[in-house]
Swiss-Prot record:
InterPro entries: ChlB/BchB/BchZ (IPR050152), Nase/OxRdtase_comp1 (IPR000510), Nase_comp1_CS (IPR000318), Nase_Mo-Fe_CF_bsu (IPR005976), Nase_Mo-Fe_CF_bsu_N (IPR024564). It comes from Sinorhizobium fredii (strain NBRC 101917 / NGR234). This is Nitrogenase molybdenum-iron protein beta chain. Keywords: ATP-binding, Iron, Iron-sulfur, Metal-binding, Nitrogen fixation, Nucleotide-binding, Oxidoreductase, Plasmid. One of its GO terms (cellular component) is molybdenum-iron nitrogenase complex. CDD domains: Nitrogenase_MoFe_beta. SUPFAM superfamilies: Helical backbone' metal receptor (SSF53807).
Amino acid sequence: MPQSAEKILDHAPLFREPEYRQMLAEKKLNFECPHPERLVTDQREYSKGWEYREKNLAREALVVNPAKACQPLGAVFAAAGFERTMSFVHGSQGCVAYYRSHLSRHFKEPASAVSSSMTEDAAVFGGLKNMVDGLANTYALYDPKMIAVSTTCMAEVIGDDLHGFIENAKSEGAVPPEFDVPFAHTPAFVGSHVDGYDSMVKGILEHFWKGQARTQAAGTINIIPGFDGFCVGNNRELQRLLTLMGVSYTFIQDASDQFDTPSDGEYRMYDGGTTIKALRAALNAEATLSLQHYNSRKTLEYCREVGQATAAFHYPLGINATDAFLMKVSAISGREIPETIRLERGRLVDAMADSQSWLHGKTYAIYGDPDFVYAMARFVMETGGEPRHCLATNGTAAWQAEMTELLASSPFGKQAKVWPGKDLWALRSLLFTEPVDLLIGNSYGKYLERDTGTPLIRLMFPIFDRHHHHRFPLMGYQGGLRLLTTILDTIFDRLDRETMQTAVTDYSYDLTR
């Protein structure tokens, strides 16, 4: 036997042992009705060509591996950024298990959320009873300061009235009448997680701000970070920069502590987050800035309605984007950008110059959320790199127009193509027919790396197969330095692998790069 009590093997080496190889081969032969190997090989090779690419890109009724998630996931993430807030998803239990596992696998932290556990009867007769019982249990068991309600497909298809259900639950004593239960409709069959995030944040702000008098506090700023798998590192880095500038600010939806709790013997179901007191006071801010435009369109519109100035960015990382963000903050707050931050900027510029010979002319395929793809394309062009494929499954026509304008602004973007609404199976065809040097995305890109040989750089949610990336920033000048290092490490690692064969390629296996 390949293992015993004295020799325990991990699954990776275990399944490579002869006994398991034989078992898997027999299983395939006897139970999987396999096609002849030659036919499989021919089809595989056909799928790499231009003829298949045209068929692949013409798909309309089938989606294969979309680079997005559903609205309620964004709503659950949004709720995690507020003080002692329990996310309550009106729908089936299985859906909520998906949101929790997705967040837990990325952040390596518990992700708390509950559901109304709707089943077949609720799908027919409505989920009012589930809502009443669920809110009562949530309030009694988990001691939240706020319960944020969102929805799944089931509740939206039958048209459950969240506002009416919540009021009924309060009248029946499930929660006290004054208890805060904001809500948002987040149907999973349209939009994506960024829309769910936007709707939930808007719903929470509307809950606390509607009907309240506003007294503007000059120079104060609200920051909405957006759905960000790197929120732990990014939020803390931006807070550090704003503190160095002496800015009076409030982070609206800050999940950095919730998804980075310490191991000190105390379990924290809730940790950190924007306090309800700060949330109420945020109405009086002079301006609200969003770090991700496509994550906050509804929210910023509401902020303008209450009288605030607004501005939106596209995931401010790199030189130009960080410059624009800090200058906007400086203009609103009246605070100068201190010398400490100017030095950080200079160090990033110096690092980019030091490594220019390795970065210039590198080609990239970038996929992910619209703001992230925009930001990464802008950053690689700053380094002399060339984006060739920019893909966002949840990208809109407006995003495509913005991307086209960005890419046209630099000679490094002239050969780029923008792909809104396409999925990762389409990207596979693009990588085979128009190969690039590097692929930037999330863990789902590892199958593209396996098939096409394009090195994957994991820089976006979700990252399941690597640990702790989210603890370090991508935004700001310090984040840009880490991003630069990550790209360079991937380039050098590949070069080392390609030049390590003794007496064949090792004349370029250099100690100094």
